[in-house]
């Protein structure tokens, strides 16, 4: 029986997404205006946040850009926020958008070097525990100087490379032939178990690396975008920022690494999968074949990419330009000196990042609603009016942590530092208390936010990447795998805030490592973004 036009419209709406999912999105779109106009705009704002989180959680059913975008368009249309506010959020977050467009594409042109290095690491370290710790520490070290998104882009690029090599051979093809690694139809039953184990192995390495970016990112002022905002507000330089964070970040780092080793040893929370022997054999053969077939031109490419990698790390660590612009320089240098000059060859590099860039723009529309409807105001006001200084530090950390799990952690950090800055200007708190609160805000936004992909842009990027469905990494699985880290990082961080930060900071003052700041302040900034 031929399909009616009405049915065709319904069939086309959100494509292959399940019918219940389509129904859920339609119901959200019907309910939201009623709640906004007839119940309470504040309630409608929180409802929108929950609905947006739902679209992220269902990322494997339907990419969140379409359903999330429809919700955001409606929110602007009914007046929950204004187009100008969304544009302002995008302006404030231009560095992040540039980072995604250019840096992720730049990493694409360095994948030969990355695959070369990581193949050596993967095949050289036999112990899964040591390998996991190596990934976690490497990601932490890189994230202290580079942006976490850049580090995750590197790891994703490497993982896709490893996955496609094995998938190609398991489908009965050679390592050099063309192959679509998104389809499993050609995989035989014998190799299917290996494939599942390999997926679990890659999932665990990616999650260790993801958490590593949080462990390293919290330590320095260039590690995460909100750190930069907080450092600017407090007037701290690179070295002072590291020292002030140490009472919290050092114990958290060591406990994070210990957690990495323990979850692997006891094979809990989805960790512990070993690299299957058949897969190792295929990767060894691939490595040998690559080495045997490497021409002088290939070697020259590796040298060029190594030089560009040095420029990338130095440029980012010294902050010689905005991250996105350094990414653009990487694209130009890498393509010019490795001979990639056709437009269609360059286009592939942008495929990974642009859908996520669009999704992030939608995310900032939701952040605009959070600001306009003052959704976090009750929490912030309650914490600021606590009299006991020690309790206030702990509460700031906890409140930041909880809000960072559901919202953009840069937004949360920026809102809090502005409120604290205002309190300092009005004489509600002393400058020393302001400095301690800045530490609580920075660690509170960075550490507990590993709980969900909403909190960490790097996790969100991983969840919505082309790699996530290949290795079966869903929102729920990500939350479960992050759980041991969430508990350890959040609690050790809290212990650092409660027990270590005040006495250690006093000791740093006495030792002359840092100086007592006077009341000088920078004008409060408006929301920033990832």
From Swiss-Prot:
- Coarsely, its chief localization is membrane
Q: Which InterPro entries match?
A: Na+/H+_antiporter_NhaB
Regarding the membrane, this protein is recorded as: Multi-pass membrane protein
Offer an example of a GO molecular function term for this protein: sodium:proton antiporter activity
- Cellular component terms (Gene Ontology): plasma membrane
* Reaction(s) this enzyme catalyzes, per UniProt: 2 Na(+)(in) + 3 H(+)(out) = 2 Na(+)(out) + 3 H(+)(in)
Q: Which UniProt keywords apply?
A: Antiport, Cell inner membrane, Cell membrane, Ion transport, Membrane, Sodium, Sodium transport, Transmembrane, Transmembrane helix, Transport
- Which cell locations does it reside in? Cell inner membrane
Asked whether the keyword Ribonucleoprotein is assigned, the reply is no
Keyword Ion transport assigned to the entry: answer is yes
Membrane-crossing residue ranges in chain numbering: 13-33, 98-118, 123-145, 149-166, 205-225, 238-258, 308-328, 330-350, 356-376, 393-413, 451-471, 480-500
The entry's function note states: Na(+)/H(+) antiporter that extrudes sodium in exchange for external protons.
Q: Which family does it belong to?
A: Belongs to the NhaB Na(+)/H(+) (TC 2.A.34) antiporter family.
Q: What is this protein called?
A: Na(+)/H(+) antiporter NhaB
Organism in which the protein naturally occurs: Vibrio atlanticus (strain LGP32) (Vibrio splendidus (strain Mel32))
Q: Which gene encodes it?
A: nhaB
